[in-house]
């Protein structure tokens, strides 16, 4: 998070003077779905994945309680067919403003009415947009938008489209994402070493 601010500044104040555009300009799709008829009773053990707000956490996807629907139900949600690298944003409820990228392995998938799909054009990298949306400053902005409407804790499609997004050069966006990936690899390596040390310790104690 500190690296984001270090490289790009505050994305809300845009104190680095980057080009700024409404999110609707740099995306090919913004939209949310619906809950299939029958609600929870319509969910299945397998089939097409239905992403709900409980699955979307900041920077990570939660697989617990992942719902599935039939092909017939999925066809009724063909306006929200997920694609690889789509950015997810919770737009209603207590988890409003949480955002992550859809994992490829759960596709084919749809979203319900509480989750918004954001599909990026080539000028903005999905991973960069996700990091921007979950930046502390941007989270505060999203919460204030969600709390200002007639319906509490909700962000409309129109409000998502109008969100002002900083647009640094793609090369710089890529550089930042490469840095994040290296950090993630380091974390995995450290955890593996800790696990191995614990196993060794446990075997010595026996």
Q: How would you label these PLM feature ranges?
A:
Residues 57-68, 87-111, 127-131, 140-146, ...:
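Short, ligand-facing micro-motifs at secondary-structure edges
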Residues 24-40, 54-84:
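Sequence-specific dsDNA recognition surfaces
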Residues 108-116, 124-127, 147-174:
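A short glycine-rich beta-alpha junction/loop motif
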Residues 51:
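Cleft-lining beta-strand/loop regions that shape enzyme active-site pockets
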Residues 1-34, 162, 166-174, 181-206:
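Non-catalytic DNA-recognition/assembly elements of restriction-modification systems
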Residues 120-124, 137:
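Short loop segments at secondary-structure junctions
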């Amino acid at each position: 998070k500190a690296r984001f601010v270090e490289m790009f500044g505050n994305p809300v104040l845009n104190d680095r003077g980057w080009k700024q555009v409404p999110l609707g300009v740099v995306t090919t799709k913004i939209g949310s779905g619906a809950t299939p008829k029958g609600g929870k009773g319509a969910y299945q053990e397998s089939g097409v994945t239905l992403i709900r707000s409980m699955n979307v956490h900041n920077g990570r996807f939660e697989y617990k309680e992942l719902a599935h629907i039939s092909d017939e139900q999925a066809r009724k949600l063909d306006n929200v067919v997920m694609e690889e690298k789509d950015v997810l944003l919770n737009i209603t409820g207590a988890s409003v403003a949480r955002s992550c990228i859809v994992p490829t392995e759960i596709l084919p998938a749809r979203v319900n009415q509480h989750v918004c799909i954001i599909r990026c054009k080539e000028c903005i990298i999905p991973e960069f947009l996700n990091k921007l949306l979950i930046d502390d400053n941007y989270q505060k902005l999203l919460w204030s938008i969600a709390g200002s409407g007639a319906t509490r804790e909700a962000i409309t499609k129109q409000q998502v489209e109008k969100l002002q997004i900083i647009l640094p050069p793609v090369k710089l966006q890529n550089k930042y994402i490469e840095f994040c990936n290296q950090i993630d690899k380091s974390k995995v390596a450290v955890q593996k070493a800790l696990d191995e040390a614990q196993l060794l310790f446990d075997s010595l104690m026996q």
